[in-house]
From Swiss-Prot:
This is Vitamin B12 transporter BtuB. Ca(2+) 2 binds at D213, D215, Y249, D250, D261. A motif (TonB C-terminal box) lies at residues 597-614. Residues 38-152 form the TBDR plug domain. Residues 1-20 form the signal peptide. Ca(2+) 1 binds at D199, Q211, D213, D215, D250. It comes from Escherichia coli. Cyanocob(III)alamin binds at L83, T85, N92, V110, S111, A251, R517, Y551. The gene is btuB.
């Protein structure tokens, strides 16, 4: 279950909370400021999801995890594996930075937005999710927030799991994490997931050529990691993973031409690192390489036919991060270097291009009596748009024991991607999108109820848009986002209740029209309890109405999609100390709804699974 953390403030006995899984008091978070710190010292709103949460919810995709979290809205073109977009606090899908073990996810293609429908949930051991601007720490993209997917495992042992469900869903997984001697650990994982799917296009709503078919998804994953303690303070690791996905989807069709309706994605990532953990100094050096090849093609002609489209991206990263204990807090500093390379013919890029970025950052955290102060500044030197500086600051005031007020301000930016710069409609003179965000929050513990409420405003300028008349991208867009976010957690006997409320008003500042696919109102509720060894969970989500475009006519029309209430029920039972049987019904009342106009979501689905550990 998701449950509020109750942690001791550093150098204080007062506990503050965030929305997260129940865990020991000394749990640390690394994503907020790129160094380990008690979760309660972080002034930004933080959510942590553990592997236990993922198993309890019985989710089959990363998107199914994220949709349950505060501030997140997801739009998807059909079922599992179909194109999806993530909106955090009303910002664009490419305004959320996605990290894998602290390293930027290599984005297949040149869209600049992470499509997590393709990332295997089997690799996820933990998610740290930070809301608000974080460009002063991570650089480009971190306007709405940061999602850090962590793959490292802690508990030794071997697990075999299997699951079957609606739409011919099958899932098989085997993983092991073993101690080799006193100082060496090895992790291996293999995963196979398949679903026949359902027809992604909603009948009669898009004007598309009828394609009465099933749009299925197949994924094969492998993961390996080797860790070794060189001494009491020095350690190193090497890690590699890859996945091979195939997705069928519905696409526009012109008689006599190939029907491009199949996607084949190959992705591999390798990284190695060296860590030092002293009493006052922590330091880490990590290098990584990733390569993604994303084919879209007509299966009758094959992915090497001239009609096929290939997005081929290589990414190189080098990170050096440091943190020093100073006074009642710490100071952090580091350097990030990244190079992205495309091959000729990638997407709509006629040539191969490189883009390099070097970022230098400085962070600080101090506890001064009843006040906690946090700040960061970063300068990025990019091969395309040269230098860009961002900064942020936050202050927390414990005005009454157990109650705190937090105020923060931060700037952020989004660099133009390679497609916008050099593609068929590219403009090499594009400038980065810029953001200024304010937030104020109260949090506390009242009568056993752990709560937090915040209000925020985000002004984004220099938005990159496409001009259909000049056939070029350009900077002129402005967006204003205003929102209220509230989270509450409390227990009533054996029941644990977790509630979040999001009001998000995201509008085009020039036309005052709401931004597409973002619901203005969301309410999420998680109820967990255990009775007679049965572990029950009920998930409720209300998504308010949202707007989208109808592309079946010209000029395009704006359409309003109604709101929907969704219920999931999950139960698990330990047959033996090693064998657990699980069952789940998703979309219990079989609601018919869309999160992207013209693309239907899954109806009622059943999943039966089991796992054996030894």
């Amino acid at each position: 279950m998701i449950k509020k953390y109750w942690f001791l403030m550093v150098y204080s006995v007062t506990a503050f909370s965030v929305w997260a899984q129940d865990t020991p008091l000394d749990t640390l978070v690394v994503t907020a400021n790129r160094f380990q710190e008690p979760l309660s010292t972080v002034l930004a709103p933080v959510t942590i999801v553990t592997r236990e949460d993922i198993d309890r919810w019985q989710v089959s995709s990363v998107n199914d995890v994220l949709r349950r979290l505060p501030g997140v809205a997801i739009s998807q073109h059909g079922g599992e594996g179909q194109l999806s977009t993530i909106f955090v606090r009303g910002t664009n899908s490419n305004h959320t930075l996605v990290l894998i073990d602290g390293v930027r996810l290599n984005l297949a293609g040149v869209s600049g937005a992470a499509d997590l429908s393709q990332f295997p949930v089997a690799l996820v051991q933990r998610i740290e999710y930070i809301r608000g601007p974080r460009s002063a720490i991570y650089g480009s993209d971190a306007i709405g927030g940061v999602i850090n997917i962590i793959t490292s495992r802690e508990n030794t042992g071997t697990e075999i799991s299997a699951g079957w469900g609606s739409n011919s869903y099958q899932h098989y997984d085997i993983s092991t994490h073993q101690q080799l001697g006193e100082n060496t650990r090895v992790t291996l994982l293999g995963d196979y997931t398949y679903t026949r799917g359902f027809d992604a296009v909603a009948y009669g709503s898009t004007g598309m050529q009828p394609q009465s078919d099933r749009d299925g998804f197949l994924s094969k994953t492998f993961y390996g990691k080797l860790e070794h303690n060189l001494s009491d303070t020095w350690s190193g690791f090497v890690r590699g993973y890859g996945y091979n996905n195939r997705t069928k989807y519905d696409a526009w069709y012109s008689p006599g031409s190939p029907l491009i309706d199949t996607r084949k994605l190959y992705s591999q990532s390798w990284d190695a690192g060296l860590r030092y953990a002293g009493e006052t100094l922590q330091s880490q050096l990590v290098s990584s390489y990733s390569h993604s090849k994303d084919y879209n093609y007509d299966p009758h002609y094959g992915r090497y036919d001239t009609s096929a489209n290939l997005d081929d991206m290589k990414q190189y990263n080098l990170q050096w991060t440091n943190s020093v204990t100073v006074g009642h807090g710490n100071v952090g500093a580091g350097i990030d270097w990244q190079k992205q390379s495309t091959t000729p013919g990638t997407g709509y890029l006629p040539k191969g291009y490189d883009q390099r970025n070097t970022g230098i950052y400085l962070t600080g955290l101090q506890k001064l009596g009843d006040f906690t102060l946090e700040g960061a500044v970063r300068n990025d030197d990019n091969s395309q748009f040269e230098r860009h500086t961002t900064w942020q600051s936050s202050a927390g005031w414990e005005f009454i024991e157990g109650y705190r007020f937090i105020a923060s301000y931060g700037t952020a930016f989004k660099a133009p991607n390679l497609g916008q710069l050099y593609g068929m409609y590219g403009n090499p003179n594009l400038a980065p999108e810029k953001s200024k965000q304010w937030e104020g929050a109260f949090e506390g513990l009242t009568g056993g109820v752990n709560w937090r409420i915040s209000g925020y405003r985000n002004d984004i300028s220099e938005m990159i848009n496409y001009n259909p008349h000049t056939l070029r991208y350009y900077n002129d867009g402005k967006v204003h986002v205003k929102g209220i976010e509230a989270t509450v957690n409390f227990d009533t006997g054996a029941l644990t209740h977790t509630v979040s409320y999001d009001y998000t008003d995201a509008r085009n500042a020039l036309t005052d029209k709401p931004l597409e696919r973002r619901p203005k109102l969301q309410v999420k509720y998680q109820l967990d309890w255990q009775v007679f060894d049965f572990d029950w969970g009920i998930t409720y989500q209300y998504m308010g109405s949202r707007y989208d475009s109808d592309y079946s006519s010209w000029p395009y029309k704006s359409v309003k999609m109604g709101g929907v209430s969704l219920w999931d029920v999950a139960v698990a039972y330990p047959v033996t100390p090693h064998l657990i049987v699980r069952g789940k019904i998703a979309n219990l009342f079989n609601k018919d709804y869309e999160t992207g106009y013209g693309y239907q979501a899954a109806g009622r689905e059943y999943i039966l699974s089991g796992s054996y550990t030894f």
